[in-house]
Amino acid sequence: MHFIDQAEIEVQAGNGGDGIVAFRREKYVPAGGPSGGNGGRGGSVILVADPGLQTLLDFRFQPVIKAEHGAKGGPNHRSGASGADRLVRVPCGTMVFDTETGELLGDLVQPGDRLLVARGGKGGLGNAHFLSNHNRAPRQFTRGQPGERRRLRLELKLIAEVGIVGMPNAGKSTLISVVSSARPKIADYPFTTLQPNLGVVPHPAGDGVVFADIPGLIEGAHRGVGLGHDFLRHVERTRVLIHLVDGTAADPVRDYQIIQQELRAYGHGLSDKPQIVVLNKIDALEPQEVSERTQRLSMAAGAPVSAISAVARQGLEPLLQRVWQCLGRDPDLHRPAAASKIQPVRGQENLRIGVPLPSQNSEMSGYVYLGGGSAPRFAPDQVGH
């Protein structure tokens, strides 16, 4: 399925039905009064948020969406039938703009949210409406009013609590695939991910949290370079960002700084969101390299850095714990810990991962290893630089 997050459509509400001219004609009533009924109301076009949809692809094939017209009135004071409303399903997170004015008409976030985008025309009046003491046999009637017609721009912003951002090939798709049931395309080359991927990560409380894997950003993404500009909007609704950095890159700190600059340049509060900085692919590094790169990245970020290996499934539980804390959904620490659902890759059970420990001075005072086996904490001066 192709992911389409923008579309332009034209909506046309139904016209109101015309009123009619009719007179009562019955046996022994040669001069019956007016009996022309009113026309029916035209159908309206209404957008409805549907959690089962994740793309605006369908709107590429139906550029004009119409509702039914109202029926004309009938004799004997019968009103015409109203036209049926046209309910149009859109993904949750769809923002609707008037193309001509640029006005935001509505933001359909919750399942079942509705937005009236084109109102049906009122029905016309039959001649019975014009009966008066001065006009006992009126022949006036009115036609139904036309329904509203407008062009709309639909813009989809995915609804996820956690967004995963980073340079191409940082391991974002691998991470979301091991912590959720999402199955994005994964390959060892940049820009494997060409569209956002959503995954629901189980929470210890029993519910789930939606994560979004955003296609890789590169320098100049806020100006439309690469794929980033098209998809940065999808992290606007997130509450927390996981900033994934490739630990095997030539300069992880430089990669981190590039993404931070792009988030600031794009605006919309992205750089102000809480971030969890994560050094990935440490299974491909020596312990000393992990320690050095984690320390440097922590200094650049001014915050602790989680060191993980998504492919080896190491360090993921502590990372998720930090996510729950940022979301204010930290599980009850007093209840017995449930068995981890994230299992290490065979052969990697004893992989030792260096994770920085923050000191009271907000500088890194040491590291602790996560993974199989015991490893003592050690000070930075015990690590070769």
Swiss-Prot record:
The UniProt record gives the binding positions of GTP as 166-173, 191-195, 213-216, 280-283, 309-311
| Obg domain boundaries | 1-159
Instruction: Name the coenzymes or cofactors required.
Output: Mg(2+)
Location comes to: Cytoplasm
- Signal peptide position in this chain? none
- Could you tell me the keywords of this UniProt record? Cytoplasm, GTP-binding, Hydrolase, Magnesium, Metal-binding, Nucleotide-binding
Which Gene Ontology BP terms does the record give? ribosome biogenesis
Q: Could you describe the subunit structure of this protein? A: Monomer.
Similarity comment text for this entry: Belongs to the TRAFAC class OBG-HflX-like GTPase superfamily. OBG GTPase family.
What protein am I looking at? GTPase Obg
